[in-house]
Amino acid sequence: MFNKANSITFVANYNSMKRFFTTLFVALGAFTAFAKSYTGRLVVTVNGETLSNKTASIDVDQQGDGSYTLSLKNFSISLSGQELNIGTINIPATPYALGNARLLQANRNVPISSLGNVPINLLAQESGDKLHANIDINFNGMTIKVVFGEGYQVPNSNFETFGESKEPNRWHSFQSVTGRFASSAQTDAAISSDQTRPGSTGKSCVLIKSRELDFFFFSVIANGTLTTGRLNAGSSTASNAKNNSFLDLANKDKDGNGDPFYTELSGRPDSLTLWVKFKQGKPSADHPYATAKAVITDGTYYQLPEEKGKTYKKMAEAINNEIADTKGEWKRLSIPFNYVNNSIAPKAILVTLSTNADAGKGSGSDELYVDDLELVYNFGVEGISIKGQALANFAENTTEYTHIVGNATADDIMVKTKGQGMLVAKTVENGKATVLVASNDLSKYRLYTINVATGIDNLPSVEANKQVEIYTLDGVRVNKADRKGVYIIKDAQGKTRKVVKQ
């Protein structure tokens, strides 16, 4: 929680924080001509707690020297019930081409009067009409994180906000069910609970409850279900596929908050994590498990369970059909995504949580608590090679190398990554290769610099500058032979000779 214990500086020094951000704006410099403006969701967190979640605009402008500037317009955050207006923050950034997209990166210490150097770390992706950006500011022991753009996490996946229907915002249960039997199925099946998971910084989770439904002369168990799509009650037979959760980006229906019955997704996550606490009201040996499912699709109609005989356009799925009774304890689950069709571009995700993995099974008093659901994007590099030659002694956290090879281009560089959708941008200029590697959600990145030495047999010509060049036996150019060893000297006529420095 963001309270007195961990927010002494941020809350007690309100004016200091205002001065910090205001001075930051001035220190980064003012730029007036902007090429493109993006509007989207801006989320600001301090030490893990969300302080602001609103619509904002960011401008991106190309400068005369080829660099870019990101301008966060009219930046403000909510602090202790007050709106803190910061102004416009401008961040110069270096561009890296990435297919039809562009990555923008900055990592610099900003000197601010009376505050010293404040580190700012930026990584953004500009693709078509969308911008996604991560900005990290470390100030006085606080981690301030600014995320712009959606499409990489499920909104309200920490279950902190609930609407008038009692459903968590951007999630839907039987309160908003549709279909032939909607009137019989409607109930408060998913509600807020204060039983948060251990270590949570939030105040609530979601409680999903099953119940019995009476149909004339018989009754059925209605599994408690929550989804990012919408529930359809189309049959009195529980196992019928007409009873489902579904999404369709073409569907124009809105819930009571004005939100659609779907969640858009642009990312390629590696796993789904969530905290659960599950209790069967009446133990069932044949049907003991709750379930959690997430399916990434191209945004066309999709439902769970799938209707037999129909083909759906799905890219990946993460499924756990064996969530056992946790005996009153919280348990963290990590469910890997299985990519079934990588050729499909991600457009939407359908997450469905239910008190039983089998339709109509379990009891009418089962309870599934869920907290802090998250899409995880792996980050890591296993190796880098140039023209098929692996970098010698490669270590993931070592970022500078020298590699002897003939003339190389960016296409000659291969990077083996650990994440499903990791981003790799490469440039080669003036004998130096730069490789920018990032997680698919931009939350982590690393820059590798490789001095691409040509070797003794491939020394570059110096006819243009008429100067003598000095190389080590490894092919690395140096300013002078000031240490013991063997050097290769190349004169203005292109002639070379070996020199031994004693």
Language-model segments: which ranges?
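Edge beta-strand at a domain terminus
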Residues: 35-41, 54, 88-98, 128-155, ...
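Bacterial Sec-dependent N-terminal signal peptides
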Residues: 1-39, 475
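Aromatic (Trp/Tyr/Phe) and Gly/Pro-enriched flexible surface segments
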Residues: 148-269, 273, 287-298, 303-378
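Residue-level detector of functionally pivotal "anchor" positions at catalytic/ligand-binding pockets or at interdomain
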Residues: 378-385, 453-477
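C-terminal tail/sorting-segment detector
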Residues: 19, 454, 486-502
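Terminal processing/anchoring signals of secreted or surface-associated proteins
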Residues: 72, 274, 456-459, 475, ...
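Beta-rich interaction/scaffold domains
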Residues: 378-456
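Extended, low-complexity, turn-rich repeat/linker tracts enriched in Gly/Pro/Ser/Thr and Asp/Glu
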Residues: 78-80, 278-288, 300-303
